[in-house]
UniProtKB/Swiss-Prot annotation:
Tagged with keyword Nucleotide-binding: yes
Organism field: Staphylococcus epidermidis (strain ATCC 35984 / DSM 28319 / BCRC 17069 / CCUG 31568 / BM 3577 / RP62A)
Name of the gene: purM
Reactions listed under catalytic activity: 2-formamido-N(1)-(5-O-phospho-beta-D-ribosyl)acetamidine + ATP = 5-amino-1-(5-phospho-beta-D-ribosyl)imidazole + ADP + phosphate + H(+)
Main location: cytoplasm
Official protein name in the record: Phosphoribosylformylglycinamidine cyclo-ligase
GO MF, one annotated term: phosphoribosylformylglycinamidine cyclo-ligase activity
Length: 343
């Protein structure tokens, strides 16, 4: 190892140890289409093995935001990687694409092999749960860019869908139903506000809240919707989908709608998670604003024909996914979303 490089703040040996630690986690995610192994200059994936007639590649990249601060402050590094995967694969899933592979980027003040292993374990868990290969990544040690103990992670996912099956919302029509899939909690958005509420409330994160600790509640990994949605695609014609992330209902559901149509949502048709009630009370936040920030208990929405509602609910529930009929599509040139019972 270069002594000069070490004196500048880069520990190459720690990097080597981190790679050794993560190898077994990465290997459990690999699919048969992956060519080669770790250590190459570029990762390779054989699309021909998918047996698609006209594959369309769909890509997405994202991070975890300031949820990371909670994970770092409380030394809980083994699930934040699931969030990084979920934020990417849930996004590309909205086109009907099956996620194929994932790459990660970790930047840190100092490479601590045990911490890197925990982060990559979480990433690998998310990849394994969605049959997505973790085929590459980068860990950068940048002591001058981050404070001690800090790190940031970002992910990049690629999926594929048959061109004729690509979902873009163009087949959405008046009268179709909106199905909401339950979230696992806050997911990965709104954490600057969450952390502000934690600080102002003075709550101790190891205290109990609704059957678990506050910390477990706030760090609950983002739900992965890949398997239930890919299964549902085999049974019905999905018209459009939305991943409820930053901007809540107001920002994300209209993204799936053609001009002239609007989503009418009955907010009494699904339960609001207790964590959102707590946040709203602590921050004295209006219900309208809450729906403009958080998922409020619905992390993903799909639009289907009315005749397919029961099949949709039955299929999703058989995949251990809680789902509700939460609204319908109406004509409206001016307002892209109507939330009933919201002030």
């Amino acid at each position: 190892m270069s002594k000069a490089y070490e004196e500048s703040g880069v520990n190459i040996q720690a990097g080597y140890e981190a790679v050794e630690r993560i190898t077994s986690h990465v290997e459990r995610t690999l699919r048969k289409e992956v060519l080669g192994g770790l250590g190459g200059f570029g990762a390779t994936f054989d699309l021909s093995q998918l047996k698609m007639k006209a594959p369309v590649l769909v890509s997405g990249t994202d991070g975890v935001g300031t949820k990371l601060k909670l994970a770092i402050d409380y030394g809980k590094h083994d699930t934040i990687g699931i969030d990084a995967v979920a934020m990417c694969v849930n996004d590309i899933l909205t086109t009907g694409a099956e996620p194929l592979y994932f790459l990660d980027y970790i930047a840190t003040n100092k490479v601590v092999p045990s911490t890197i292993e925990q982060i990559v374990k979480g990433i690998s868990d998310g990849c394994e749960q969605t049959n997505t290969a973790l085929i590459g990544g980068e860990t950068a040690e940048m002591g001058e860019m981050y404070h001690e103990g800090e790190y940031d992670i970002a992910g990049f996912a690629v999926g594929a869908v048959e061109k004729e099956d690509y979902i873009d919302g163009s087949n959405v029509e008046e009268g179709q139903a909106i199905i909401g899939l339950a979230s696992s909690g806050i997911h990965s958005n709104g954490y600057s506000l969450v952390r502000k509420m934690i600080k102002e409330s003075g709550v101790q994160l190891h205290d109990q809240f609704n059957g678990q600790t506050f910390l477990e509640t706030f760090l609950a990994p983002t739900k992965l919707y890949v398997k239930p949605i890919l299964e549902l695609k085999k049974h019905i014609d999905i018209k459009a989908m939305s991943h409820i992330t930053g901007g809540g209902f107001y920002e994300n559901i209209p993204r799936a709608l053609p001009k002239g149509l609007s989503a009418k949502i009955d907010t009494q048709s699904f339960p609001t998670l207790e964590v959102f009630n707590w946040l709203q009370k602590q921050g004295n936040i209006s219900t309208n604003e809450m729906y403009n920030i958080f998922n409020m208990g619905i992390g993903y929405t799909i639009i289907v024909d009315k005749k397919d509602v029961q099949t949709t609910l039955t299929t999703l529930r058989a995949m251990d996914t809680t789902a509700y009929e939460i609204g319908e599509i109406i004509k409206d040139d001016d307002t892209p979303i109507h939330l009933l019972e919201v002030e």
